[in-house]
Amino acid sequence: MFLIFLVTESGEDKMSTNGYGPGMARAASHAESWYSSNPKELDREISRWLDAAGDRVGMARAIVSPHAGYSYCGDTAAHAFKQIVPENVDRVFVLEPSHVVCLNGCALTTCSKYRTPLGDLHVDMEGSSLKFETRT
């Protein structure tokens, strides 16, 4: 599920949706500018960074990771993501600031998947709709 959280000064929880409807896919808008759009090249780059990160030193329950272009932060992000034990992961929440508009609250996606060069990432639509309904 893709979430954007911002705390408002008044403490009010406000939410908006981004205009995508169920069944719609969001394109990889930064492919070829922030990371390779070639699946084999991208997989090779990510694998190289993860290999260079060394052994896992713990088991992450949450990760705070940079999200700039991979050429700037791929190696740093790999150290964080190396701590993930994939078989222990039930759900992934992506939290990030909006770089496009100023939000007074948070935005929830209504698209059902994100297209990436490595394949589609499916959104937990039930979890997303429950989050929207509860306004939390």
Where are these regions (language model features)?
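Bacterial Sec-dependent signal peptides at the C-terminal "C-region" and cleavage site
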Residues: 3-17
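Intrinsic disorder/low-structure terminal segments
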Residues: 1-4, 113
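Active-site histidine-anchored catalytic micro-motif
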Residues: 18-136
